[in-house]
Curated annotation (Swiss-Prot):
Homology family: Belongs to the herpesviridae ICP4 family.
Biased composition (Pro residues): 66-75, 273-285
Function comment: This IE protein is a multifunctional protein capable of migrating to the nucleus, binding to DNA, trans-activating other viral genes, and autoregulating its own synthesis.
Descriptive protein name: Major viral transcription factor
GO molecular function, a single term: DNA binding
Keyword set includes Transcription regulation: yes
Compositional bias segments (type: Polar residues): 878-893
Keyword match Ion transport: no
Length: 1487
């Protein structure tokens, strides 16, 4: 009760401080008034009907300024006041003294009140006359305050009252009975408390002061009815036209929001103001007949002023930024973030009696210098409507006669009508956090918070992590509400939003410094997810709409619902909050217009506000266009078709027109995107282009095929959106009404995405055909042609792209050209859409098309002679014209031509081929060969198949550069080859048919599209396609798992029939097809496959190898080298434990034959390339076969994301799947060629294809196959290459020492030329060239081409992307280890992996040669530089003579002593020459 009784105290004290009323003068004046200083002879000029500062004319525009922090109020003089019935609330019955109060009029106390006001003004500026303009008082008063008058000349505006008498002291005079006591206190928690009796007095004061002109006599709290002045309802509602209400009772005062004459605000009488009342005017009296006591008059006066100011503050919007307040008005009392902005004027007295002031945080500037930072804000997310209504109220003062706030949404309060607990702003330096009313220290100065605040200020979408220090939460709340209504994954984003690096740092910062110090994981924070602001902001604003994100996030966090149930709850929340988020009346207008319909002035202002930039007409048009798009493509068309008359069949549009409409929609989408990119300057600035916001199709493809009108409407709507965006770009800077905000642009993008995802199946998910048919490109191509052709091509393009007219359209009875865009006459025409190329608007020709117009010939079924139509074959025709070739028209492929083949005889078209079929209607190259891309699945045969090529950007009937090659198969009349692929049967696929077997459940890789899953090949065709010796019988079932592979094989079956009754021709096994099918010969039996390695080869890399074209007899092109992207060469180098460089044997450019991977195949490892035939089918076949046998397949994926094929294999999570990056940059010699000390080092981690991944794979293999031999992936024996060496052009390396001696030494047996022997055997060559053994002594010991093993540095995930060697932070000892280490070739040695963060714990291995057999140092040639690696004991370089043949030993031990013990026996080498000059000392056969 105590909190309810002191409601008036803070407002009274705020008013006193805002008007520079000092505490001491006011106390003295109030005491003097209560003690009864009276002058009966003086008339009551203050409370007469003079329309100046009377209770009946309370000044509505009394200046109000931002208040300073309130301080404890002093107790009234005289000690505790005795309670009177008028001041008692619900304390008890009236006292006898109050009952005996006389009802006769008492002497007028006006002189005492005038003296009090005189004393107050004298205390503010004693003896200084009028206050200087521009000065600021300590209390923060307004220098331009009209109340601050000259204290030497006037006591009150318009009052001739004499100066205050000298006898009027606070302690003098005969005291009058005190009927009411004022208790002034502060609502701040720091104010001092009063005694219980004083608080009771204050309660009575607040009870009467919190009442309004139209409230009831009693409060909800049960306070007793107290006699107090009541105003006249009529007087409050209908003031006098002249501005003077006339004589009225003293308790009458205007209602909040009533109009006030200008003289009342300025403090001086205007010419139009009424004259002061005569001195004999009756003094105001109580309703019971008694006059108001002086203290009660002060209370009522100040109460009226407070209520009037509160009402005007709530009614009046904030002036625009940078403009000063009007004369007589001051800025708002508080900034918008420190005061509730709800419309409290028309609410109950509880709502208007708790303004909740916020402590001032900075020094108050004078009113004329204070910046206008407050913004008029409503508790509504529709800020445009609120701003328009506020502007209407400001521009139409006459609208104040209506009830204030009728156009504002009622704030959400407690059931008892009170503000929510904890709605008060947090104390200075703290922000909301935790439960109701709790807070924490603010962290505004932390760098993470500063960066987050800057990102929040620039963000257009909701930020994933929000803290109160980032700023006003209104923007975040509105963005969250918008996202809940617009995003498909709203709940997922609220619960698990994707965090960038900066947002992740902010989330970690909040967890460490905000959440962690305050308790366990279930403590109350006020927001259930990171993006949500504290719920206290919504409670303080009373905005029920802001609770929507909290409700959605709470459901998203719950584990008691599954995804479908949560989706239902989200849809329910959207429907429940829809009217609140997007308010509209019955006529579809915003709330602001419907709310002010009863007030003409506000209605006119609100109607005018619709033309403001906040609610422009283009935004409405954007929304209407989006609505039309959704309605045109929606599934309701199917229901309308089903409701047609029974027995009638709706006409189905032709496939040609559907394709025309699809291309038109594609071009319309592209036009909108171009306009958006020009408007915003880039795709990143266009809102809505987010993968998470891609909508689902509006209807299935089958419903779209029966809705051509919807396609046309959607295309027209998109072009309207394009025009709106262009107007915004061209006129937005000069005319704000044409601007489009982020919400409108997001809606436009969404309209384009809805059309795109719906029409995509109609154009076969390919926009190339529509781009090729853009009419503007045809004109552009014409004007860019050579000078001899520019005139003719431009004229042809202009004539063919002429706009269609009604006169050009043929009637149904006349034989003529087709209507616009090639559709039938009965189906209408797309007259409002841009023309597509080629279009025939009615041009007729009776002759054969010339070379300038090679076209198919269309014929009408009802006409006589077939009329020809002219089109242009674009790219091929231009190329042919430039060469001066003559073309012959080919056979037309169109529905009209197929319907009437009599008009397309062979005599009329000599260049056509009789066996041209629709299935082969694909482009041909210069050699006449068909392209080898697979045929696309089609659900319809016949006419629809004939247009599959035109939708992809080329004209199947266009001429080619050279005549096509003759067919190897002669088709019989009427024979037509069957289509390899077709739609999935309705009854389901046959188990022997060709189709995708996608596993159920979750997969490691993306699942294929519906179109790929719908492709089907009949079992009889499958058996005929795979029955070929090129495909091993054990692997043929894998082909049935890949319809794309079957289509590729069918495209190659162009030879004569293999046997009688065959439907297809014999398969022509070309070289490329053999290379793509070579993987089937790696492992004969699919049951033996245990590990599958997936990779993406570079250009011209394959396991068949071959001589490059630069060599005689070579046919293979040299592969391209890439430092960034790894292919087959990088894969084999990693599996073979060696370094890949461009000059090494490991690169495919140096191969002269196929690499040998039989050692890997023997372990059950299958290497599969994305370019191999049936790549997808093989993986899914192995997964199905091994999974059926309860075995798990180990899949190592080295394919990059951009190289993963569309509709690639779906690998079930039942199997083991490991993915790593494959790149040559793992070798330090490739990444940092200048770092010589790291030339033999290779980086590795679990994310790189190398020993880090292989260790995981080997461990998994050991668990899957414990009885099998361990998997050995990183061994030199796994891979062997075929390269050019001195042993032959196609030498398999490494060549074993025995085989090396057998192949090389006989060639030099008996040779007398020692120089030729030295050069042939490589006596003077470096021991190792690019890592491979090259010299004679190295080849004789380890084998020719045996490679040095690298040192692997485990760098972790971050080190794998290091740009500079310094980023690795390699210890100095480890760097020295890599420089001197020389790991000799060993086919079975495991990889040497060293952690990059530690120094090595062993000595670097080196190679030691036996003394007396040449140099003890090992020469290594790398990147054109030779390096000499010395043994450990040698300190200086040893130089030997030329021509020495040495015996070698190994030094593998940790110390020289151990090395001598483990030294091998000398290897004997045959004498290579019997020359006497050579000497016998190096002959190992001599003792």
């Amino acid at each position: 009760m105590a909190s309810q009784r002191s409601d008036f105290a803070p407002d009274l004290y705020d008013f006193i401080e805002s008007n520079d009323f000092g505490e001491d003068p006011l106390i003295r004046a109030a005491s003097a008034a209560e003690e009864g200083f009276t002058q009966p002879a003086a008339p009551d000029l203050l409370y007469g009907s003079q329309n100046m500062f009377g209770v009946d004319d309370a000044p509505l525009s009394t200046p109000v300024v931002v208040i300073p922090p309130p301080s404890p109020a002093p107790e009234p003089r005289g000690g505790k006041a005795k309670r009177s019935p008028s001041a008692a609330g619900s304390g008890g019955p009236p006292t006898p003294a109050a009952a005996a109060q006389p009802a006769s009029p008492a002497p007028s106390p006006a002189p005492g009140l005038a003296a009090m006001l005189k004393m107050v003004h004298s205390s503010v500026a004693p003896g200084n006359g009028r206050r200087a303009t521009g000065s600021s008082s300590p209390g923060g008063g307004d220098a331009a305050d009209p109340v601050a008058l000259d204290s030497d000349t006037e006591t009150c505006p318009g009052s001739p009252q004499p100066e205050f008498p000298s006898s009027a002291s606070p302690g003098g005079g005969s005291p009058a009975p005190r009927v009411r006591s004022i208790s002034i206190s502060s609502s701040s928690s720091s104010s001092s408390s009063m005694d219980e009796d004083d608080q009771a007095d204050g309660a009575g004061a607040s009870s009467s002061s919190s009442s309004s002109s139209d409230d009831s006599d009693s409060d909800e709290g049960g306070e007793e009815e107290t006699p107090r002045p009541r105003h006249s309802q009529n007087a409050a509602k209908t003031p006098s036209a002249a501005g003077s209400p006339g004589p009225s009772s003293g308790g009458d005062r205007p209602a909040a929001g009533a109009a006030t004459p200008k003289s009342c605000r300025s403090g001086a009488a205007s010419p139009g103001a009424p004259a002061p009342a005569p001195a004999s005017a009756p003094a105001p009296s109580r309703p019971g007949g008694g006059l108001l006591p002086p203290g009660a008059r002060i209370l009522e006066y100040l109460e009226g002023v407070r209520e009037a100011n509160l009402a005007k503050t709530l009614e009046r919007p904030e002036p625009p930024a940078g403009m000063a307040s009007p004369p007589g008005r001051s800025p708002h009392r508080l900034p918008k973030d420190q005061r509730p902005k709800s419309a409290l004027a028309g609410a109950s007295k509880r709502k208007r009696a708790n303004p909740r002031p916020r402590p001032q945080t900075q020094t108050q500037a004078p009113a004329e210098e204070a910046p206008q930072t407050a913004v008029w804000d409503l508790l509504d997310m529709n800020s445009s409507q609120a701003t328009g209504a506020a502007a209407a109220a400001a521009s139409a003062p006459a609208a104040a006669s209506c009830a204030p706030g009728v156009y504002q949404r009622e704030p959400l309060l407690t059931p008892s009508g009170d503000p929510w607990p904890g709605s008060d702003p947090p104390p200075m330096g703290r922000v909301r956090y935790g439960g109701t009313g709790d807070s924490r220290d603010g962290l505004w100065d932390d760098p993470e918070i500063v960066l987050a605040a800057s990102r929040y200020a620039e963000a257009q979408a909701p930020v994933p992590v929000f803290v109160p220090e980032m700023g006003d939460s209104t923007k975040q709340y509105n963005a969250l509400v918008r996202m809940v209504f617009e995003s498909r994954e709203a709940m997922s984003w609220l619960q698990n939003s994707k965090l960038s690096g900066q947002d992740q740092n902010l989330a970690q910062f909040c967890q460490k410094f905000i959440h962690a110090p305050r308790g366990h994981g279930s403590f109350i924070t006020g927001s259930v997810a990171n993006p949500l602001p504290h719920i206290g902001d919504a409670m303080a604003a009373g905005n029920a709409l802001w609770a929507l994100p909290h409700a959605a996030a709470s459901v998203a966090m719950s584990r008691r619902y599954d995804r479908t149930q949560k989706s239902f709850i989200l849809q329910s929340l959207r429907r429940a909050y829809a009217d609140m988020a997007y308010p509209r009346d019955e006529a579809g207008r915003p709330d602001s217009l419907a709310a002010v319909a009863g007030c003409p002035a506000q209605a006119a202002a609100a109607a005018a506000s619709q033309q403001q930039p906040e609610a422009p007409a283009p935004s409405v048009r954007v929304r209407e266009a989006y609505t039309r798009v959704c309605a045109a493509l929606g599934p309701r068309r199917k229901a309308a078709a089903a409701a047609a008359a029974p027995g009638t069949r709706a006409p189905r549009p032709s496939a040609f027109r559907l394709r025309e409409l699809g291309d038109a929609c594609v071009l319309a989408c592209q036009a909108v995107f171009e306009a958006l990119l020009r408007l915003r300057g880039g795709a990143s600035a266009v809102p809505g282009l987010d993968p998470s916001e891609i909508p689902s199709p509006a209807c299935p493809p089958e419903a779209l095929c029966s809705n051509p009108a919807g396609l046309e409407t959607a295309a027209l709507s998109l072009y309207e959106l394009r025009d709106l965006v262009e107007r915004a770009r061209l006129l937005g800077d000069s005319d704000p009404t044409h601007r489009l905000g982020s919400d409108e642009l997001r809606l436009a993008v969404r309209a384009v995405l809805v059309v795109a995802r719906t029409v995509a199946p109609l154009v076969r998910y390919n926009a190339e055909g529509a781009r090729a048919r853009a009419s503007a490109w045809t004109v552009t191509q014409a004007v860019f042609s050579i000078p001899s052709l520019v005139g003719g091509m431009l004229g042809e393009a202009v004539s063919l792209l002429a706009p269609p007219t009604r006169s050009q359209q043929p009637s149904s009875s006349s034989p003529g050209g087709e209507p616009f865009s090639g559709s039938a006459a009965a189906e209408g025409s797309l007259q409002t859409l841009p023309p597509l190329w080629p279009t025939v608007p009615g041009k007729q020709s009776a002759t054969v098309p010339s070379s300038h117009s090679q076209s198919p010939q269309h014929s009408q079924s009802g006409g006589g002679a077939g009329a020809t139509t002219a089109t242009c074959c674009r790219a091929t025709q231009t190329n042919a014209r430039s060469r001066g070739q003559q073309h012959q028209p080919q056979k037309a492929r169109s529905p009209q031509a197929a319907a009437s083949p009599a008009h397309l005889s062979q005599e009329a078209m000599p260049g056509s081929s009789s066996d041209d079929r629709a299935i082969h209607g694909r482009p041909r190259g210069k050699s006449g060969k068909r392209r080898s891309e697979p045929l696309e699945p089609a659900a319809q045969a016949g006419a629809s198949a004939s247009f599959s090529s035109s939708a992809r950007g080329y004209d199947p009937s266009g001429p080619v550069d050279s005549p096509p090659a003759p067919k190897r198969r002669v088709a019989t009349p009427g024979h037509q080859a069957p289509r390899a692929l077709g739609p999935m049967p309705a009854e389901g696929p046959d188990r022997r048919g060709g189709f995708r077997r996608v596993p159920r459940g979750d997969c490691h890789t993306p699942r294929p599209s519906d179109a790929a899953c719908a492709a089907y090949c009949p079992p009889e065709l499958v058996a005929e396609l795979i029955d070929n010796q090129l495909f091993p019988e054990a692997w043929r079932p894998a082909l049935t798992f890949d319809p794309q592979a079957l289509a590729t094989i069918a495209a190659r079956c162009s030879g004569p029939p293999a046997r009688d009754g065959a439907r297809l021709g014999e398969l022509a096994a070309s070289g490329p097809l053999r290379r793509r099918a070579a993987w089937m010969h790696q492992i004969p039996d699919p049951e033996d496959v245990k590990v599958v390695v997936l990779y993406s080869p570079l250009q011209d890399e394959d396991l068949l190898g071959g001589l490059p074209a630069s060599r005689p007899g070579g046919s293979r092109r040299e592969p391209l080298w890439s430092d960034l992207k790894g292919g087959l060469s990088a894969l084999l180098a990693a599996l073979g434990n060696r370094i890949l460089t461009k000059r090494s044997h490991a690169w495919a450019g140096n191969w002269t034959g196929a690499p040998d991977v039989s050692a890997l195949n023997a372990q059950g490892v299958l290497l599969l390339s994305t370019g191999d035939l049936a790549f997808t089918g093989c993986v899914e076949y192995l997964c199905l076969r091994l999974g059926s046998a309860r075995r798990k397949l180990l899949v190592l994926d080295a394919v990059s994301t951009e190289d993963w094929p569309q509709d690639g294999p779906a690998i079930s999570q039942y199997h083991i799947y490991m993915r790593a990056a494959l790149t040559p940059r793992v070798a330090c010699a490739v990444r940092w060629p200048g770092e010589r000390h790291l030339s033999r080092a290779v980086l590795t981690s679990s994310t790189l294809f190398g020993p880090g991944l292989f260790a995981r794979a080997e461990a998994a293999f050991a668990r899957l196959y414990p009885d099998s031999a361990p998997l050995r992936l990183c061994r030199s024996s796994n891979v062997a290459y075929t390269v050019d060496t001195r042993a032959g052009e196609r030498t398999r390396v490494p060549l074993a020492p025995r085989e090396y001696r057998q192949r090389v030494l006989p060639d030099y047996d008996g040779c007398k030329d020692m120089r030729a022997q030295a050069e042939g055997l490589g006596f003077h060559d470096p021991d190792f060239e690019e890592g491979a053994a090259q010299s004679h002594r190295a080849a004789n010991r380890w084998g020719l081409g045996a490679w040095l093993r690298p040192v692997y540095l485990a760098c972790g995930r971050r080190g794998a992307g290091a740009v500079e060697p310094s980023e690795l932070l390699i210890p100095e000892l480890l760097s020295e280890f890599c420089r001197v280490a020389l790991l000799e070739p060993d086919a079975e040695a495991e990889p040497l992996v060293l952690p990059i963060t530690e120094a090595p714990r062993r000595r670097a291995p080196r190679v030691d040669w036996e003394p007396g057999f040449g140099s003890r140092s090992t020469s290594v040639l790398h990147m054109g530089a030779t390096e000499l690696c010395l043994p450990e004991p040698d300190d200086e370089l040893e130089i030997d003579g030329a021509g020495d043949v040495e015996l070698v030993v190994e030094h593998p031990g940790p110390s020289p002593g151990v090395a001598q013990a483990l030294r091998r026996a000398p290897i004997k080498i045959e004498v290579v020459s019997d020359d006497e000059d050579g000497g016998d000392w190096c002959n190992p056969y001599l003792s």
